[in-house]
Amino acid sequence: MLTSGIVILSGGLLDPNPGLIFWTAVTFVIVLLILKKFAWGPILGALEEREKAIQSSIDRAHTAKDEAEAALRKNKELLTKADAEAEKILREGKEYGEKLRADIVEKAHSEATKMISSAKEEIEQEKRRALDELRNEVADLAVQGAEKILMANLDADKQKAIVSSMIQDLSKHRN
């Protein structure tokens, strides 16, 4: 029926229509088959490719992480060895420095002792030489005094004057 340009269908929206249900089901199955044939395969293939790429990236990341951890452990070991070696070198250098210092001090002490000994010996020689010289002068003066006394048989006052004169001569010779 047609009333004022509007077609009124009989039945409501909630009333089951077997023809509509059949054609809806057939259309759904056809669309499902078309999607399965043309879209489902490529979509699943793309998803599988993406999954493989992600898994490959994860595997590479794990491998890189393991390699980095191994390198880090190796670097830590090398650093520990280098620290130990540096400490050993410093300790050996310190020991060598101490030994060298002790050797230098001992050598300087030995040289100082030698120099002191040499200086003492030289002083002793100079002292002996001066004493020998003094003895010779005293002996010469005594001989001269004895000569003068013997030559001049003089009285006590003159002898005292001669001895005083000799003492003055002795003082002059010493200076």
From Swiss-Prot:
Its main location: membrane. It is found in: Cell inner membrane. It holds the Pfam family ATP-synt_B. One of its GO terms (molecular function) is proton-transporting ATP synthase activity, rotational mechanism. InterPro entries: ATP_synth_B-like_membr_sf (IPR028987), ATP_synth_b/b'su_bac/chlpt (IPR002146), ATP_synth_F0_bsu_bac (IPR005864), ATP_synthase_B_chain (IPR050059). It is a single-pass membrane protein. One of its GO terms (cellular component) is plasma membrane. Keywords: ATP synthesis, Cell inner membrane, Cell membrane, CF(0), Hydrogen ion transport, Ion transport, Membrane, Transmembrane, Transmembrane helix, Transport. Disulfide bonds: none annotated. The chain crosses the membrane at residues 20-40. Gene3D superfamilies: F1F0 ATP synthase subunit B, membrane domain. PANTHER family: ATP SYNTHASE SUBUNIT B (PTHR33445:SF1), ATP SYNTHASE SUBUNIT B', CHLOROPLASTIC (PTHR33445). F(1)F(0) ATP synthase produces ATP from ADP in the presence of a proton or sodium gradient. F-type ATPases consist of two structural domains, F(1) containing the extramembraneous catalytic core and F(0) containing the membrane proton channel, linked together by a central stalk and a peripheral stalk. During catalysis, ATP synthesis in the catalytic domain of F(1) is coupled via a rotary mechanism of the central stalk subunits to proton translocation. Belongs to the ATPase B chain family. F-type ATPases have 2 components, F(1) - the catalytic core - and F(0) - the membrane proton channel. F(1) has five subunits: alpha(3), beta(3), gamma(1), delta(1), epsilon(1). F(0) has four main subunits: a(1), b(2) and c(10-14). The alpha and beta chains form an alternating ring which encloses part of the gamma chain. F(1) is attached to F(0) by a central stalk formed by the gamma and epsilon chains, while a peripheral stalk is formed by the delta and b chains. This is ATP synthase subunit b 2. It comes from Prosthecochloris aestuarii (strain DSM 271 / SK 413). The gene is atpF2.
